[in-house]
């Protein structure tokens, strides 16, 4: 698609310009897509201005001194409450008056497109359109009460005399009064009439009608400041804030329309997350529940610290709890619960999931020892070694050590990655990764460096920082809120995020060393804990500012430099950005200060400030939804190995500074894995892993190719580029970091047309199929014998007398019995494939046939249908006799039965007189033999039967489970002619079901269809498919034979039976040979079968393809993404799909952008906006 594709198609543009004015005004629909009477617009205007009219009445009474200001507020609020209830009652009346089933308003596209037939100004349809009503009765009452309170407080907030006192300017008072009431009317309309669709949308569905409270909540926040200023008159800063906020109050409609102010649910989560991180010293969490629990516990810890009366007790309390709260307590409790379930006999035994932290007794022991050392160090240093800060004090000496540690850790970290600062090639990093063994050997030196870094980071640095804090004299200022907040946070951050805490403490130490003997506010007004808090906030916002500036510059430049991103408007947009650079920069700074995404509208250089939201960016539970498909299984298999590999990568520092909100992209062959860091603590990290689609679209392919180029330049072509080569893809949002070994499946596809089309291979295929099928049948019977040997043999069968020679000839097997009967049977099967053995007279009820039952064969001189053998079941003798009588009555024979009164001779299949007593353990089930097979085909199979191969198979089996000498058992079984005849019958039943009665040389197309299980229909095939177990064995043998044909063509012919056995045993043990669409294929992947093979056909090229998956350790490439670029594109996606509803399949924002990786970023978003095919639950990765 060209670069001039419309951002919104014609239909969506019209839709947008109807929706946006509604958003600005808070809900009134003054622009419709169809003709409407004027009173529709007049009614909405009246409802919109009702709060102003009622508030104006109270304002007049207050200004003329009839009522006091607070009575004025009560008066206006009461009127508004009555009006709100009247409006809602009108809606209820209209809904009851109509007989049609009413569907209440949903915030979706269809609601905006519904058409109404209006009859009158106050008709039912008019009322229902103008006043849609609430979903819940509780909301009807609650929203009306809120509307009344809002109108009353709004009247008080905008009283002219009060405004004149604030500003002392009549013109300013008039402006604020007019536009202030416009803001209140916009907020009231969503409460009493109809809420607007907000550009700031967090949840896709507004189930509980929270959106209606969004605008009133912000109005209440402004009014709260004014009320505080009214009752607290001694705070000049509060009065100044009130004056400023009255002016900002006028611009609330624009802030709502631009989506800068967050929805209430996002605001609460964002507020808790920011407070937990910067005030309480914690980390963003992987779920809303964890955020809430940790927020409450951390806040309780900080409050409790305020009441501790002793400084040593304070140090012990905040130092100990700071360490404990930084541990992964939730995951430890989950693992402990699993262990208790496994050990307790009264609880259901369940083993821990493979993705859970495999916790042993060592970790709690180490943590307990560390806790004791922390308490001992902190208390002793605070009690015995504290002193005022000076250049030579103990705290200053510790600060020097901290500086050395920070520099050392930074150097050791940069040595681990592919690039230094993401720009210069790291000379210590291995330049070529194509040979796994060589790469791992050469990386061993860096692994030793990583161990040293890990020790410094997890043990040395935290204890050094504990010493620094414990020596601070500010801890003696008991019952101080700043000390409790600052030092509780500081002791917690040491363990929660050691690298950031070390950097912040070094900055504070350097500043302290420079200004310790001066009287600047840094020294006088702030204690060490608050200094650390401020530095942490500044550090975080500066890092975000740099990332956002990089993202903005990339969007600006690529809108011109990338040919496919260049639009007709690109020049104008770039010019506007240059001219209004201060405003653009202020937008970037504002988004950094608010920690909100910088939204590039449609990924164009049109920058807006998105609303603040949690680090996870999405409201739903992590990993709760994904677009699952057959390819999902490959990500499920590789995730445990990838988590283990990430453990060492995170701990070594090769992935750079890992903080909550960091994004990484992993690449291996056609797989793209998206990593999001959710939380970070002491020796653990919580991540979410997403798998992107494997069926590559054109846009996906373009970006995946660029990803491959970036990784190849970093890991495969670095040697030719030079030791200190520059990163030529520095502007890309992805920076290559490292490679990690992961045990996963490599995917290889080969063209098999030359093999499957070979006439020699096709002729040999039938003989190989007989051998493979024979091996499969014998092994199946052998396994059954091992599983059933432990069971006692049926007593009746044990005590049964040996049959006579006559019985053996007539009853041992119906097919191998009387030759005359076989010839007669053969005559009726000359046109075998066109007959059915169903009950054509429908005398007996039809049942599902699960096997061949024992039959009654009528012998002697009797009349019957010529050439047929009459049979009947003996399961129910009475029913069968009636059935036989009915049969003769239908046919209409007139001769009397000469054998009437004689006992019917019954013969059972299990009375085969095997020559060996062990043959019964390996016999074929009788329902695996097609009794109607012509004798001619049996004779044909006897000629093709590989007797040497048959005997060789028995020599390879272990018969110790039969409690005899294996050699004796093997010899007896191989010489048992009855057993051999039975296997010949089984082979014939399957072979001719596959290849047909003609037994022609198969074609390549037939071979492909048969591999898929789509053989041409025949009676024998119908019989075979009616026995699922046998059919699966036959299909397995067929596929093994096909794989054998491929291996013989590529590796050479099979020299002897031993080699053939080795091939088949390898197929059986290490391979899954089938179809990639089979459920068994997915199970084999999850069970980690070493090899998988499938056959396919490319209709475009007209060739047959073979696909082989090989499980082995491979190197997965990992790159770090610009987190702000990802958040910005996700924010734009949310705006575009949830507000503009731009569901066009070819919309501009999912087109390929090789620099910003726009298509891949959209895929990685949570459904319904994105479409990852796999998304894991939060995975806890230990970092030790």
From Swiss-Prot:
The chain crosses the membrane at residues 40-60, 73-93, 141-161, 166-186, 218-238, 244-264, 305-325, 366-386, 391-411, 455-475, 502-522, 573-593. Glycans are attached at residues 523, 848, 915, 1132, 1159. The keyword tRNA processing does not apply. Disulfide bonds: none annotated. GO terms for cellular component: membrane. Residues 788-820 are annotated as: Disordered. The keyword Glycoprotein applies. Keywords: Glycoprotein, Membrane, Transmembrane, Transmembrane helix. It is found in: Membrane. InterPro entries: Pecanex (IPR039797), Pecanex_C (IPR007735). It is a multi-pass membrane protein. Pfam families: Pecanex_C (PF05041). Belongs to the pecanex family. PANTHER family: PECANEX (PTHR12372), PECANEX-LIKE PROTEIN 4 (PTHR12372:SF6). This is Pecanex-like protein 4. The gene is pcnx4.
